[in-house]
Swiss-Prot record:
<dbReference type="GO" id="GO:0005960">
    <property type="term" value="C:glycine cleavage complex"/>
</dbReference>
<dbReference type="InterPro" id="IPR013977">
    <property type="entry name" value="GCST_C"/>
</dbReference>
<dbReference type="InterPro" id="IPR022903">
    <property type="entry name" value="GCS_T_bac"/>
</dbReference>
<dbReference type="GO" id="GO:0019464">
    <property type="term" value="P:glycine decarboxylation via glycine cleavage system"/>
</dbReference>
<comment type="subunit">
    <text>The glycine cleavage system is composed of four proteins: P, T, L and H.</text>
</comment>
<protein>
    <recommendedName>
        <fullName>Aminomethyltransferase</fullName>
        <ecNumber>2.1.2.10</ecNumber>
    </recommendedName>
</protein>
<keyword id="KW-0808">Transferase</keyword>
<dbReference type="Pfam" id="PF01571">
    <property type="entry name" value="GCV_T"/>
</dbReference>
<dbReference type="InterPro" id="IPR027266">
    <property type="entry name" value="TrmE/GcvT_dom1"/>
</dbReference>
<dbReference type="InterPro" id="IPR028896">
    <property type="entry name" value="GcvT/YgfZ/DmdA"/>
</dbReference>
<comment type="function">
    <text>The glycine cleavage system catalyzes the degradation of glycine.</text>
</comment>
<comment type="similarity">
    <text>Belongs to the GcvT family.</text>
</comment>
<dbReference type="GO" id="GO:0008483">
    <property type="term" value="F:transaminase activity"/>
</dbReference>
<dbReference type="InterPro" id="IPR006223">
    <property type="entry name" value="GCS_T"/>
</dbReference>
<dbReference type="GO" id="GO:0005829">
    <property type="term" value="C:cytosol"/>
</dbReference>
<dbReference type="GO" id="GO:0004047">
    <property type="term" value="F:aminomethyltransferase activity"/>
</dbReference>
<keyword id="KW-0032">Aminotransferase</keyword>
Length: 364
């Protein structure tokens, strides 16, 4: 039996088409995925992301533990509320999950991890936390709503108290603050400005309704996927998993190699991979008719004349750009063009950086 978030009833009242998403009943769309996508790019949309797992870590050695657990380095976190994106790797350098970590105090950090990987994440964290005497609290008492788009912050702020408005005033991206009963973070998964807001479960339905009344459009998983793909953001299980190195998933920037004496899980394997070279994640653009889909083969000839093949990890029609885009994992050596096999047709594609839209504007 699939679980329901505290907002399930609100979704049905808003006319959602509900689907089972990794054991959670979640809205796919509320009538038009396209309208929802455009609302986020041009105005404000919101997503129920309460299926994500919030984990609070407390203890005097929490920072030391996270410096070992994560490939990125929480030593960078010195300002209260600052957030960091990181991979959590296994010993062979594969990605167990990608997550966000927030710093509150020396003995209090917060993780937000994916829903699909919840059980293995919690097991892995618990196993490795034991020697550090960390107190782990899974915050199933909290709901999480993402409000995204150019007008999202202004519309969400109409629901805030004076204290909450002051707390978020001038807050830069990738920060979070606890203000009253809301935890408000300037994070998201769309390439737009906005907030991800955690609140007690019993407050979620009223907050959702108030957002609807303030002109924020409910959005489902369909729009969430096209938005994150336009923004070049990875989806766990597609761009990376336990068999894929972060170096092959455009996550090299999230690996803190310095200081060289910091030991983190997967470091040794990553150093070998960095030395040998890995596949890479690239963007693909196809302006001709057709749609680039997951798992389609990508073929190209490198500078030495070798014929090589990669694979599309995520592909879709981009509502913002009006043509097809994809992320693809390919061998090193790809040039500016490639061929994608769509049924019996060989379609030419342009190879780009793995990001297509930022703040509503084309970058590919």
């Amino acid at each position: 039996m699939a679980q329901q978030t505290p907002l399930y009833e609100q979704h049905t009242l808003c006319g959602a088409r509900m689907v089972d998403f990794h054991g959670w009943m979640m809205p796919l769309h509320y009538g038009s995925q396209l309208d929802e996508h455009h609302a986020v790019r041009t105005d404000a949309g919101m997503f129920d992301v309460s299926h994500m797992t919030i984990v609070d870590l407390r203890g005097s050695r929490t920072r030391e533990f996270l410096r070992y657990l994560l490939a990125n380095d929480v030593a960078k976190l010195t300002k209260t509320g600052k957030a960091l994106y990181s991979g959590m790797l296994n010993a062979s350098g594969g990605v167990i999950d990608d997550l966000i970590v927030y710093y509150f105090t020396e003995d209090f950090f917060r993780l937000v991890v994916n829903s699909a990987t919840r059980e293995k994440d919690l097991s892995w964290i618990t196993q490795h936390a034991e020697p550090y005497a960390i107190d782990i609290t899974v915050r199933d008492d909290l709901s999480l709503i993402a409000v995204q788009g150019p007008n999202a912050q202004a519309k969400a702020a109409t629901l805030f108290t004076e204290e909450q408005r002051k707390a978020v005033e001038g807050m830069k991206p990738f920060f979070g603050v606890q203000a009253g009963d809301l935890f408000i973070a300037t994070t998201g998964y769309t390439g737009e400005a906005g907030y991800e807001i955690a609140m007690p479960n019993e407050k979620a339905a009223d907050f959702w309704r108030a957002l609807v009344e303030s002109g924020v459009k409910p959005c489902g998983l369909g729009a969430r996927d096209t938005l994150r793909l336009e923004a070049g953001m990875n989806l766990y299980g597609q761009e990376m998993d336990e068999g894929v190195s972060p170096l092959a998933a455009n996550m090299g920037w999230t690996i803190a190699w310095e200081p060289a004496d910091r030991d983190f899980i997967g470091r040794e394997a990553l150093e070998v991979q960095r030395e040998k070279g890995t596949e890479q994640l690239v963007g693909l653009v196809m302006t001709e008719k057709g749609v680039l889909r997951n798992e389609l083969p990508v073929r190209f000839t490198d500078a030495q004349g070798n014929q090589l093949e990669g694979v599309i990890t995520s592909g879709t029609f981009s509502p913002t750009l009006g043509y097809s885009i994809a992320l693809a994992r390919v061998p090193a050596g790809i040039g500016e063009t490639a061929i994608v096999q769509i049924r019996n047709r060989e379609m030419p594609v342009k190879v780009t950086k793995p990001v297509f839209v930022r703040n509503g504007k084309a970058v590919a």
